[in-house]
Structures are given as C-alpha cells and as structure tokens.
Amino acid sequence: MSILSRVSDRRPDLSLVSEEDFPYEQDIVRNPGSTKPWLAYIEYKLQKGTVQEQAYIMERACVQLPRSYKLWKMYLRFRTKHVSKLNAAIFASEYQKVNSLFERALILLNKMPRIWEMYLKFLMQQPLVTHTRRTFDRALRALPITQHNRIWALYRPFANSAEGETAVKIWRRYMQVHPEDAEDFIELLVAVGLYTEAVHKYIEILNNPRFTSKNSKGHYELWSEMVDLLVEHATAVETGHETGIDVERIIRSGIERFADQRGKLWCGLATYWIRRGSFERARDVFEEGITTVMTVRDFTLVFDSYTEFEESIISALMEMASTRAEKGEVDEVADFDLDIRMMRFEHLMDRRPFLLNDVLLRQNPNNVTEWEKRVALWGDNKEEVVKTYLDAIEAIQPKKAVGALHQLWTNYAKFYEAGGDLSSARRIMEKAVKVPYKSVAELADMWIEWAEMELRNECFDEAMKVMAKAVQAPKRSTVDYFDETLSPQQRVHKSWKLWSFYVDLVESVSSLDETRKVYERIFELRIATPQTVVNYANLLEEHKYFEESFKIYERGLDLFSYPVAFELWNLYLTKAVDRKISIERLRDLFEQAVEDCPPKFAKVIYLMYGNLEEERGLARHAMRIYERATRAVADEDRADMFNFYITKSASNFGLPSTRPIYERAIAALPDAEARDMCLKFADMEKRLGEIDRARAIYGHASQFCDPRTNPGFWTKWDQFEVQHGNEDTYKEMLRIKRSVQAQYNTDVNFIASQALARSQQKRMEEEAAGNGGGEMDAEVADAMAQLERQARAPVGFVAASEGPKGGSMPVQPVEVHNPDAIDLDEMDE
C-alpha cells in the first residue's frame, strides 16, 4: 500500500523499472503522444509485473496522456478493484486517494458519463452522503440532459437509501424531468411523513389528463388512495385556503361522481371529522349519508358505522360517569349529555326500518309495494298513515307504477272505511277511478273494489249504481279494447272482468229481466266468452226458459268456432237430448254439429248421435251414423271407431253383418292396425265355421306381417292350420311365409327393422336372465350377418316344403317375440 502511495505522489521510482522494460520504455519515448505503446506496456506488466509496477505504469500513462479515456478507465478500474475488498470506514484514507484520482480524471474527462458512473458507484460504497449527493449534482450539471438518465438510475437508489429530507430533495429534482414516477415519490413522501405534499402531488397528477400510471392504476384508484391518505392522517394534513386542500369538498365531489362508492365515501368523510375531533360534524355527515344513499348496501355500511360511532361515544361517557361515581363526584351536565345521547341512539335504532324504506323508495318512487310497507311501519299512527298515502299518490306516476297501484288506492279507502268514515272512502274511490292506470284490468279492479266496499256496508243500490256507471258506454261502441292509445277509462266498458262482476251482482240482488238485459248488453258489445254463454243458458234453464236457453247456445255457436264450439255443442246437445225434444229437431242439431266439425272432435259427437238413434230412432240409422263416423274421425281414432261400429253391428244384426265393415276397415286402416283387424276378422269367421274364409283372410293379412318382426301372426295361423287344415293347406301357409320373408329381405328398411327387433328381443331376454352385454352384442352381430346373407341370396323358386336342398343347411330364423302382441284367444274367452 505504501508503494501505491508513492505512485500517487507522481515521483519517479526507477526501482520499478527493470532491464526487460527497456523496449517498452524506448517505444514510449519514440511515440510520446500515442496510447498504443502505453497499452502494450500495461498489458505486459499485467502479465509479468507486480501490483506496484502495474500501478506505476498506469499512473505514468495517465500523467503523460491525461485526456485518454481508455487509459483513465483502465487505471480507475484497477484502483477501485484493489480497494473494493477493504472496509470503507476503516480504510477511509485509501478510499480518499481513489476519490482524488477520480477527481483528477474528471478535470479533463468531465463529459464522459462512464467515468461519472464509476465514480458515483464507488462513492456509494463509502459513508459520505453529503459528498456523494454533491457529486451526483456535479454529474448532472456536467453532462448533457440526454445522458441524465444514466445518472438518475444511480441517484434514485442512493436517495432511497439516504431517506429523510435528502431523499425528498433529490426526488423533487427528479420529478422535474420524470413526472411519470410521481407514484414512487408519493410513497416516499408518505413514508417520511410529508402528507400535505403527498396530497398536493396526488392533486397534481389527478388534474393532469396526460398522466398515465406506470402501475396501471385508474383515475378512481388514485383518487381513492388520496382520500384514504386524507382520512387516515386527518390531523397531519394541512388544509385551508393557504394549502388549497379542502377535504370535505374533495370527498363530496367523489360522492357525486362515483355512485357505487357512496357508502364508503360517506363513512370516510365522517371518519375524517371524527379524527379531527369534530364529533357533531361527523354526526351531521352520517345523518346526511343515511338519508341520501341509493342502495341498501351503502345504507347498511353507513348505518353500521353511525351506530358504532354513537356506541363508542356512549361507552366513553359511561366510563367517565362510572369513574365519577366511584369518586363520589356529581356532574349534572355530563349526566344530562349522556342521557341525551342514549335517547338519540335509541331513536336512531327505531328509525332504521323507515330509513331503509326511504332508500328503496329513492331507488324507485313508483314502487307500490314499498309504499305499502311504509304504511305498515306506521301501524296505528293514523296521521302518518294518511300522510304516507298522500305522499305515495303524489310520488307515483301511474304509467310507471311497479306493482298493483289500484291496491294502494283500495287500501287507502279501506283505511277510512275501517274508521267508519264511508263518505271519505267514497271520495277516495271517486278519485281512484279517474287515475290513468297502466292497464284496463287495474281500472276494472278499482271499480270492482268500490262496488265490493258498498256491498260490505250493505249499500246494494249504491253498488249497482257504481257498476252501472263503470260499464256505461255508447249504444254502439266501436272502441277496441286493446287500443293502447286510448286511456283505460275509454276502454273499461269492454272489460269482461267488469261485466262478469256486474252480471253476478245483478243476478244476486235484482230480477231476471234486469239480469237478461245485462247479458244482452254483453252480447251487443261482443265481449261474451264461452263461459258467458254457458252461464246465461244455465240461468234461463234454472228459470224454466228452456227454449230461450237453447237460443243462447245457438248464439254462442255463431260467435265461436272450433275448438271452443265443440264444448258448446257438447253442452247444447246434452241438454237438448235430456230435454227430449223431437227426434227430427235433434237430428238437425247433430247434423249441424258434425257439418264443420274437425276430425279431432268428431268422435264424441258421432257417438252421441249414434246413441240417440239407438235409443229413440232406428238401429239402421245408427249404423249409418257409425259408418259416417269411420270416415270423419281423426286417423288415431279410426281403429277405435271401426271396433265400436263392429261391436254395435254384431249386437244389432249379428256377426255376418260385420263382414263388409271388416273389409272396409282392412282397406282403410294402416298396415299395423289392418293386421290386428284381420286377426279379429279371421277369428270371427272361424267362430262362424267359415274355415276357408278365415284362411283367405290369414293369407291376405300375411302381406303385412314379416315373420321376423311379427311372429305372433304366424303362430296364430300355424295353430289355425294345425286345428282346421290339412297337409296341403299347411304347406301353402309355409310357402306363403317364405315368400313374404323373401319379399321383406329385399327391403333395406325392413332389414334394419328386423335387426332392431332382434337386438331389442335379445336385450330383454338377457335382462331377464341376468346375462352380460358382451354375449348380446355377439348374437346381434350374428343376426345382422345372417340377414345380410339372406338379403344377398337370389330370389328364385320357393319350394312347398322346408328342408335342406342340394346339401345346403337351412337357415333357422331367429324367433322374435312381440311384448305388445295381444292374445286374441284369451280375449275371446
């Protein structure tokens, strides 16, 4: 270290130059202004020389060529590396020598940022805060502004490590050139307790529309951080005209702007005043908050904070009162203040349901349900109840009402009715029926409520007058009930609900003639419903006006078409048949009923018609009607109709009479139903002993029955031939069976249906036996392969007997059982 000291003294030390160095020394002498020989000399010494020799050569080089950046950089790096392992506090003198070396270099190289960076990094290793800060400032002054970022990259960490006032001053300078890092500066200001300046910085960046947070914070988030700072350090932040900080104004501006954060901001403003000791102002803020917030969430937040604030004050006052009691002191003013605060707190808790209701009504003053709840909250307080009803009526816009507005008016009138003031209730009802409700139905309900009120008070004449006024309309009204451009008052006279109540009222308290007039008026206005027709007809029937009753049904049938007309015809025909009017007239009615009747509804009417002919007419006429019915009914009812027709024909004219019916049924019905009909037909012929006819029917039905999917049919035919046939007929049956099977095998659709039937049958058998699914899949695959082989086989001559021909093995068809098949033998038994 002493040698390095001598080197720094710039005195030549020839002992550090050896004979081997002469070539380099001579080269230096020959080229005194060039750095190349010096660099070669230094390179040589770095490989062969000692540390002292290396330092000596570098020192000489920098003295001879003081403007060489390369030589100085090499020398400075060499010296800083040499002392870097030493403790800067203990070896401060050694560090100071290197500092002096940097100062020498900067005399001529003060525009070199790399030299400054090396010097500043070296200084930051030493406990020289002031000197380091001044050196940073010198670097900023010496270098052009385009290179300041390199210095600030070191200056900022130094400032943060220095902390305190030093850091703040450095950051203030940094903010002048890099305002985008304001958030970091604010963190520093908060950390050192300069809250007022931090708030000013927040205000500055919030007022700058070009500011973009490097932490991706939005405008609200920054503003919220500022508010939290103001509230948390309420006493430390300087406010007033001098500082330009008005906390209440700032927070209130946020309450107006950020609607979804009002509860939090009201609590924040109140907390601010609490921390500043202004309890009354805090209470005023809480009161304003709970009476202005728009959501239940915000209300709950503010109200809970309010109650917590009051409880804390009361708790503190009670502790003080307890302390006074222990000491035996009496302070009437303090005790009175405690009593007042407790009463105020109880009043606040009592107000909670009303305040909550206010919140919901502020959200939507047209909410009828909430107004009803408010009325219920007042209970027996009649003055407040009336005031609430008046406020509701004034606040609610009828066209925007949510809920049953007419019910609010009704309850208002009932309030006076319950108090015995019927005249006031009537005045309310008179006003209520003039309100432009959203729908005619509400107005109709209002009129009905008025009439019911009169009925409850046994004022029947008044009720009649009310309803007569409600349905009052021009003689020939052309108003469209569904025309929304007209007011409900202009359309209410066509309200079916209103007329229905009116007719019930007239029917119960007035004469038949008056009731008929009301019904006739309903028909004139063309608002009658099927129920109106039925009620009117029943009324006349009860009073023995049977023919008039029938006329009403006919008028109803003129008004309504099917399907409504079906119900009216059903009632009308039933009443007419029960009345036992002339058979000719009944026939005319039934003919009218079935004339335009859709197939869907024809079955019932035809059955009634046929039953009439059976009971009061001729059986032959009934059969003709049933025959017509088989053509008129819907497809899904046709098979049932044929079966009914066959049953009636057999009971009236014997089994042979059913043959043409069976034949027409087989021709008219689809294949599946025709097959069942053939089986019944064949069974009937068998019972009559017509074996050949039965066999012919089986032969005809065979074309509908694939042996693989309909084995039940072939089983029955087989049993039939066994019982009644011979070898020839049995062979013929087998021939037909093979022929049909071959026919179906050529149809891809039938092949698919056969495979499906087989798979379903196998699945059912395996489920019954508890077998696994693997065997079922194998058998289904085998069945499908067999079907494919049969489908590919050529269709040729069909032999009359079964058996192996030409050495080929017969294919045994897999028998499929139909779980839905009907055993006709059991049915016959």
Curated annotation (Swiss-Prot):
Described purpose of this protein according to its UniProt entry: Involved in pre-mRNA splicing and cell cycle progression.
GO cellular component, one term: Prp19 complex
InterPro entries (UniProt xref): HAT, HAT_Syf1-like_N, HAT_Syf1_central, HAT_Syf1_CNRKL1_C, Syf1-like, TPR-like_helical_dom_sf
Domain of life: Eukaryota
Xref: SUPFAM superfamilies: TPR-like
PANTHER family: PRE-MRNA SPLICING FACTOR, PRE-MRNA-SPLICING FACTOR SYF1
Protein name, as recorded: Pre-mRNA-splicing factor syf1
Subunit and partners: Associated with the spliceosome.
Short name of one Pfam family: HAT_Syf1_CNRKL1_C
Subcellular location: Nucleus
Region span, Disordered: 799-829
GO BP terms: generation of catalytic spliceosome for first transesterification step; mRNA splicing, via spliceosome
Keywords, in A-Z order: mRNA processing, mRNA splicing, Nucleus, Repeat, Spliceosome
Repeat (HAT) residue spans along the chain: 15-47, 49-81, 93-125, 127-161, 163-182, 277-312, 380-418, 420-456, 473-505, 544-578, 581-615, 689-723
Keyword Nucleus tagged: yes
Membrane-spanning intervals of the chain: none
Family label: Belongs to the crooked-neck family.
UniProt organism field: Neurospora crassa (strain ATCC 24698 / 74-OR23-1A / CBS 708.71 / DSM 1257 / FGSC 987)
Keyword Ribosomal protein: no
